[in-house]
Amino acid sequence: MLKMGVLLFTFLVLFPLATLQLDADQPVEQYAGNKQDLNPDEKREMILPALRQWQCCTMAWCDSGCLCCE
């Protein structure tokens, strides 16, 4: 009876948990593979707008909305 319980626990609990964990890893690997295929111009198009979000201010006007540039 104990052997049957161990067998049922293994196949009904542990095996599905291991399978679900493997499925969760696949989209991340696929997304990383797609990002590596971008050419440098496409990468630059994605990065430059993010860099332009900050504005450059003088030290007298420096606050949280801009970077202090000298």
Curated annotation (Swiss-Prot):
Main subcellular location of this protein, as a coarse class: secreted
GO molecular function per UniProt: ion channel inhibitor activity; toxin activity
The keyword Signal appears for this protein: yes
Subcellular location(s) of the protein: Secreted
Domains (record comment): The cysteine framework is III (CC-C-C-CC). Classified in the M-1 branch, since 1 residue stands between the fourth and the fifth cysteine residues.
Endpoints of the signal sequence: 1-24
Tissue and organ distribution: Expressed by the venom duct.
Family: Belongs to the conotoxin M superfamily.
GO cellular component terms attached to this protein's record: extracellular region
Disulphide-bridged cysteine pairs: 56-68, 57-66, 62-69
InterPro entries to which the protein is assigned, alphabetical: Conotoxin (IPR004214)
The keyword Signal appears for this protein: yes
Name of the protein in question: Conotoxin PnMLKM-013
Any Pfam family matching the protein: Conotoxin
Maturation propeptide residues: 25-42
Keywords: Cleavage on pair of basic residues, Disulfide bond, Neurotoxin, Secreted, Signal, Toxin
